[in-house]
Amino acid sequence: PKFIVCDEPVSALDVCIQAQIINLLRELQEKRNLTYLFISHDLSVVEHISDTVGVMYLGGLVETGKTEDIFANPLHPYTKALFSAIPMPDPDAKRDRILLEGDIPSPANPPAGCKFHTRCKECMEICKHEDPKPRDMGDGHKVKCHLYDEV
């Protein structure tokens, strides 16, 4: 195969086995020129194995780009909140956690406008009515958020 879908492939495994599986996936990727769609909630694994990242909220992409760009400079408020929950390797290091509040919409009956607006601390009136279009922020980094609408 040229394309493999990996849906939470290491989520229930112990850390040592996870590392072995991830290393095997990378080795196979290099030797066989494979492309993976790697679906995971473990952001440290995503950062380690991915070249490109897509962050999804309620079934839709809110931000895409090169892994190093997304992790260094998350733009969408959901991506920022998600990344603020990643544990720091240094126990003395501090990170401001962004706690999401508000109602979690039903995927079967999503709200009008931006699907994240019910939980977004930066919600504007337009967010409640109009779904944002993807904005290219340069070098393939795209974000769906009215905060980045062109003036």
Give the label of every model feature segment.
Residues 66-151:
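Short catalytic/signature loops enriched in Gly
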Residues 1, 5-95:
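P-loop NTP-binding/switch modules centered on Walker-like glycine-rich loops
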